[in-house]
Amino acid sequence: VPYISDLNDMIRMETLKKDIVYQILYYLSDNDNYDDLMHTVIYGKPGSGKTEISKIIADINVNLGFLSKGHIKFAKRSDMIAEYLGQTAIKTQKLLNSCKGGCLIIDEAYSLGNSDKRDSYSKECIDVLNQFLTENKKDFMCIIIGYEEELQKCFFSHNPGLDRRFPWKYKIEPYGPKELLQIFNLLF
């Protein structure tokens, strides 16, 4: 399977690698009849490899044919939140529709909301996303990336059903000095 070697080449992360392979095997075991959500969360500190892991997961799922169009898009707050009230739902829906058959990766997903929940733009965006996650579960994958505490406070807390839309959750531990030296040696 393409991109499995990229996953395997990641320094350390042995448990994460096994869990991702388990996720792949889960979908391969009953590809035609699965009714489960593919949506995934990747938690980790800055520089821990969250974005790289999200790309690998998306590429694997695309190459296994789980997503009909096979495209991968990256988004951030400004791609989903509009300038004027009432426009955010339209902007978010347009982005999500363009991702059908593919994977949407939202980096720093906690920036879509805030901890005091007084941002109606955020609510609009997250409500549209939440509905889309369920209605398009068979041919759409969403991967969100961010810091665990911020995602809980500023993203998942905005909608009680949102957390269960992401059944696959991976936490990347920070690299230690030994791993950083390995990475440095690979680069130079």
What are these regions (language model features)?
Residues 2-40:
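Pre-Walker A (pre-P-loop) alpha-helix and adjacent loop at the N terminus of AAA/AAA+ ATPase modules
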Residues 69-99:
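Short glycine-rich substrate-engagement loop in P-loop NTPases that contacts/grips substrate
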Residues 77-87, 111-123, 170:
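Flexible beta-alpha connector loops of hexameric P-loop NTPases
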Residues 110-149, 157-161:
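Conserved catalytic/switch belt of AAA+ P-loop NTPases
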Residues 158-160, 181-188:
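Conserved AAA+ ATPase "sensor/coupling" helix adjacent to the nucleotide-binding pocket
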